[in-house]
């Protein structure tokens, strides 16, 4: 089945039936809901489907769980698995996917205290750090995975990061005091660390002094463990390895031979774990006359020397991860950098067993966040693991605020069920919130969680280990069989340029493009997710990637694969914004009042009080270039104390308006934060702004920014200015009153210390409320620009849509009419095309900007030749002459008589007859002299896009853009052809065509000519389309195509379309 796009998923949701299905199918659907690509199998990476779970008492009266499991998709070949001792507490259910470690030579599988491991949902990879943190508090671990951005940066974290890097560099170079000093200074000058110092308002000198306190301990450790003459000189330790014989308790001398890897990234689908090992070291264990060599994980800690259970647990989990790459290290090392004290951490079966049980509990809590409500009942968020009562743990917990908030807003538990010591803390942490605030929080938590569990948003990285590269290449999101071709180049610290070629033959057809984020793995099983980065260049011969690790240490014969890193369903940022909105701060309180409580926005009475005298001439000159509604928008923004909404109807010069607004605000001395959801939307405004010599700073990764804007990026400016001090970085930030970034880029350190006078959010009507919130925390006033009568925020989950997730902040605040100004003069569509949208959507408010715009028609210099051909061959079909007539800007071609039935295949909807007609029309317009670049073809389903694209490729037609409505938002073409696709007798239309906003966008993309193609009888069943047909009929703009008309066009369509 082909991969579904966002819109196909909406269709499939609607068309799914409610018929009774076999039990096996129900269980398989449950498994697919969590991990759709899982293939059941035996072996090292076995995957079993749980068919039934029964709790029993054995002959000794102890509780056991008996699981009926299978590796057959049909539910055959059933096997019994018995969970004994502590494993019986694992929260496993029918429909779960599991992995079992142990001996399966004889049935049943038995997992008990002494043998085997049981992994619940192994394709959910959980970090070792999260599992270790759950030892003390499982609730904290779940909250940290859910509200990740709430774990804010601290001084200790920054010092720890710098010390890690200095140690990691030194172990590969030298621990000599002068070398350590040099490495420390180099590290402190790196821009990424300077940015964190800026965030925390720390001076470079105070950070340097604190870092230097640790350096003597680095040298001391190296002198003890690395630089000795004989093995007897190395420190003695008591290290018992599970494989040791009876002498296991005798002391041994430990020699750290060398560092083999730094920040080694390992993903383990066997154990459902992932992590980065600080340092992977080769160690010699000298015991008596024997020497054993082991490759082991070394974990670095910069805090208090505690040798705590969390620290030791983390090391033990890294020994499990290490088994994916090499033989079991059986132990690891814990090094406290403050003292240079190193502790051995044996990884015995008992410790690994208990940690994997915790991992299972954490996986269960993360996967089961929403109740699967009974039919007719609304979904609801489930309670998190219980609140603990441990004053010290809670006092320093970074998730304390979210813990209290979730308890009050979502769980709404009675005081008696909360530990007594925590009740006052929960009340104290949430007493500033009203019932309406808590309800807003819980509703958006639920909707975001539902959306994150939608099929398309839940695409994790599991295809890397579940699907061979050769198969995944068909989707265009993967390239396999790659080899390195040139020496790796170090671009800057932590970034390495790699070149790859296909081992045999050219690159396959791919959707990967420059700028795409990717994960690089080895083709062999043990080399999953070696590195992350992005595509720098790609063509049919080679691909160049900038990666976060140097892979030159791997053998030259290593085969690699590139997988696109999907970012669908990232709810960390919106949940973080939602959490911030509930904080007890002035900025959050103000936004709660405006957004949740609908406090009336306030305005200043007189423009003279905000317009500086020396800016009046500049502002007047800018206003001269604007029309009346645009000037009204400028005035409304300048007078606002809270917010303004600018409704940018189609073609009304939204980008020009925003550009003028930034220029005026800048002339008045105001600072401006310019944002939107996409990089392209931000850069479109900046491209226009740059022409007016307005200085700005563009935040974000350079490779995602338009080439002409890259010189304005922070990255490029830091490079050109050779910034190596905090003072110079502050100077850069303070010298740019206009800053631009995406809504997802607000975690940048600059925003921790800067508040802007105005924040402008473009495309605000397409942005989900919690995402749109992000930049608003950092401004005194905000301007939302959009049009809620065009595309809303895309929501895939039907329940989330029903609960209101598609309501943007723009739509929510539009009820305060005093804050709204409309742009109604448009410069895109001629009068006839505009009248369609006026009738359907805008109640006659749209008007043409000039007579030239109103009367503009398509230019077809060769139309005379085409007409001669038509009159010779098609005198019986007058519709053909009419449809190409420039003076007929709008035409609906009705296929009812043809007929043109739809096809549903491989989960997608297409209409081959419509596709053939579209290609015929396109080729004829090109013959008549229309440039292919001036033509756009729109269809609501990806299957139809592919059908049209295939037919175009097999014809003589040039490159014509074929895309969904969503991809055309904000853009236009001289000629637009729309294929509605749906044509059936049962009334099925799909969610897409019911959405009047999507229809509005489709009909407002054309400047000079709009051709609509579809079945009137099928489409008119739905109000938006019925309204469209009423208008088209009244204007006599519908042409009924004759029976079997597509066949009569075959000799023009060509043999390629007869298949």
Curated annotation (Swiss-Prot):
The keyword Phosphoprotein does not apply. Coiled coil: none annotated. It catalyses: ATP + H2O = ADP + phosphate + H(+). Residues 520-1059 are annotated as: Helicase activity. It comes from the Eukaryota. GO terms for molecular function: 4 iron, 4 sulfur cluster binding; 5'-3' DNA helicase activity; 5'-flap endonuclease activity; ATP binding; ATP hydrolysis activity; DNA binding; metal ion binding; nuclease activity. Disulfide bonds: none annotated. Binds 1 [4Fe-4S] cluster. Its EC number is 3.1.-.-, 3.6.4.12. Its cofactor is [4Fe-4S] cluster. Acetylated by EP300, leading to stimulate the 5'-3' endonuclease, the 5'-3' helicase and DNA-dependent ATPase activities, possibly by increasing DNA substrate affinity. One of its GO terms (biological process) is DNA replication checkpoint signaling. Interacts with BLM and WDHD1. This is DNA replication ATP-dependent helicase/nuclease DNA2. It comes from Rattus norvegicus (Rat). The gene is Dna2.
